[in-house]
Structure formats: C-alpha cells, structure tokens
Amino acid sequence: MAREREGRRRDDREERDSEFVDRLVHINRVAKVVKGGRRFGFAALVVVGDQKGRVGFGHGKAREVPEAIRKATEAAKRGLVRVALREGRTLHHDVAGRHGAGKVILRAAPQGTGIIAGGPMRAVFESLGMQDVVAKSLGSSNPYNLIRATFDALKREDSPRAVAARRGLKVSTLQARRRDAEPGADAADAA
C-alpha cells in the first residue's frame, strides 16, 4: 500500500515537472581556494517556465555540471512568478527594470513581431510563453544582472484589471482612456 502511494507521488511529481520548459542561460567555472590549492566547481543559471505566464530563475553550484543544473532548476521552480500577458502573447504596457548596473526596457509589440531580445532575456520570454516583445538591455551585460533586471521589469507589469482595482475604476473606463490616448485616433475619427 505504502509502496503504491510512493509510486503515485513520484508519477505526479514527474507529470508536474514535464509541464515546465527549462533553459540553461549560463554556466560558469568557479574555484574555491583551500589549503591544498584550488577546488573547482561549476555554477549554473537556469530559467524555468510553463509557457502560460509563469516563469522563474535559479542559480545552482556543484562540483559537477549536471548537479549544478539540477540545483538551479529546483531553485527556479521554487521561485516562479506569474506575469499577466495581453492576449496571451505580449505585455500590457511598456516597462523598465534594473538590477545593479543592468537595465532593461521591455516594450509591447504587435502580433507577428516575434521575440526581439538578446541573450538571457530571450530565454525568459520563451519560457514565459510570450510571442511578441521588443526588449533592449543597457549597461551591464552580465547574465545574472540581466535576468534579475528582466524579472524586476516583469514584476512591475500590471494588467488593466489590477490597475482598475487599484484606482477604483472600471476596466472599460481605463480601456476607453487608452483608446483616446493612442496616436492616430483623431485622424481615424476625422476620416
């Protein structure tokens, strides 16, 4: 009976793990100086997401590469963040984030644009399930800083529902204001 339950738990865990996509962003060889010399190990940076709006990143260190990747993946799954996507494919609004000397600017993009982003940011967007986004990184190109800056920006992303609740307005009122503020709205009305 207990063995059957244990097997079922393992199957559930494997099923949960299979829904996630993990991307290895960076591997670094690190050294610890000890009395007898240097002890070498590896550090891994991994991004994990379900391609439905949840994403996380993790850092793992170990003597062997596969063990470092496994630790980083587990850390990423523990720190998943939900991001509200517009139409399930892009951001609701432009947003910027920073961490250390790394700064990123994320812009919502029209359908068919694709993911225009470099290096570590691309891994985050692919794991998130985002299809259309334009991103620019400024300052530091360190993958750790870029990933953290990207997550900082994504945490600042708000859905119209969240903004309306915070302001005490209806979502339709916000969307009407957005349509009025779009460039070219006056030209379309005049025609």
From Swiss-Prot:
RNA-binding recorded as keyword: yes
Record-annotated S5 DRBM domain positions: 20-83
Record keywords: Ribonucleoprotein, Ribosomal protein, RNA-binding, rRNA-binding
GO molecular function annotation: rRNA binding; structural constituent of ribosome
Entry keyword Metal-binding: no
A single cellular component GO annotation: small ribosomal subunit
Disulphide bridges: none
Any one GO BP annotation for this protein: translation
Region annotation Disordered: where it falls in the sequence: 162-191
Similarity comment: Belongs to the universal ribosomal protein uS5 family.
Record text on subunit structure and interactions: Part of the 30S ribosomal subunit. Contacts proteins S4 and S8.
Domain notes: The N-terminal domain interacts with the head of the 30S subunit; the C-terminal domain interacts with the body and contacts protein S4. The interaction surface between S4 and S5 is involved in control of translational fidelity.
Known function: With S4 and S12 plays an important role in translational accuracy.
Protein name: Small ribosomal subunit protein uS5
Species: Methylobacterium nodulans (strain LMG 21967 / CNCM I-2342 / ORS 2060)
Gene: rpsE
